[in-house]
């Protein structure tokens, strides 16, 4: 079966986050994993964490000392050392080999059915110019944030909000901005981060507004 969706993440010294996110995808979304490729962009591949991520991907056998068949079927481990920045996540869209891409942080878990629902959305709207995001679930697994409000809060632009009515309705709805721990789009419609961006943060509102200026929401 041809892969439909790339799920990719960038990492910098977070083997545990990569491990748990990928294993959760494989365990709790197994019904669609044959349609998914998984990639990791490692921004510090020579560190202890980087070496462990590579071993996890390539199936390192501690008994034989050999790399074996790999622990992530169809997965690709991609070292990237040209520069170090949170915006390396944008390379997920450049490396993806499918029409649709989901970029997420390497500590994010998705509720069962979420990947299937995203694939169904793209089946229905394969040319969409929209940026797709989702709610943030609280640790109690009962409460949610649905979006960020475009206002300043504690020296950060963006204040968490919850639209109860639209959330309970269950249909996709437009939001002003959101955190960028998870976002998705059609690969050919990815608008990209500014190539001069470095460091951490600042993509919230920027990337949503850029999609709006290119005809999406």
Question: What residue spans do the PLM features occupy?
Answer:
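A conserved hydrophobic helix/loop-capping motif in glycosyltransferases and polysaccharide synthases
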Residues: 5-14, 21, 28, 41
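A recurrent flexible, glycine/aromatic-enriched loop bordering the glycosyltransferase active site
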Residues: 86, 162-184
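Short, acidic, metal-binding catalytic loop of nucleotide-sugar glycosyltransferases
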Residues: 23-35
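Glycine-rich, basic loop-to-helix element that forms the pyrophosphate-binding segment
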Residues: 80-96
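A short, conserved alpha-helix in the catalytic core of glycosyltransferases
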Residues: 118, 183, 188-189, 198-217
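A conserved acidic beta->alpha catalytic loop
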Residues: 40-53
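Conserved donor NDP-sugar-binding/catalytic core segment of glycosyltransferases
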Residues: 109, 113-155
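Short aromatic/hydrophobic "clamp" motif used to bind/position activated sugar donors
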Residues: 101
């Amino acid at each position: 079966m041809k892969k439909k969706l790339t799920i990719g993440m960038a990492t910098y010294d977070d083997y545990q986050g990569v491990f748990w996110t990928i294993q959760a995808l494989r365990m709790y979304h197994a019904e669609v994993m044959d349609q998914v490729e998984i990639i990791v962009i490692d921004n510090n591949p020579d560190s202890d964490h980087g070496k462990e991520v590579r071993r996890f991907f390539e199936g390192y056998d501690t008994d034989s000392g050999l790399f074996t068949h790999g622990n992530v079927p169809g997965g690709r481990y991609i070292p990237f050392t040209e520069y170090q920045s949170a915006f390396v996540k944008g390379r997920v869209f450049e490396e993806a080999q499918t029409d649709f891409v989901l970029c997420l942080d390497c500590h994010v878990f998705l509720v069962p059915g979420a990947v299937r629902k995203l694939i169904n959305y793209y089946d229905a709207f394969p040319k969409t110019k929209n940026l797709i995001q989702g709610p943030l679930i609280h640790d109690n697994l009962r409460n949610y944030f649905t979006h960020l409000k475009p206002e300043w809060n504690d020296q950060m632009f963006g204040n968490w909000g919850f639209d109860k009515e639209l959330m309970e309705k269950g249909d996709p709805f437009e939001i002003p901005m959101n955190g960028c721990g998870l976002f998705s789009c059609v690969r050919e419609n990815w608008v990209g981060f500014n190539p001069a961006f470095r460091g951490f943060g600042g993509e919230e509102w920027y990337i949503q507004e850029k999609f709006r200026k290119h005809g999406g929401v």
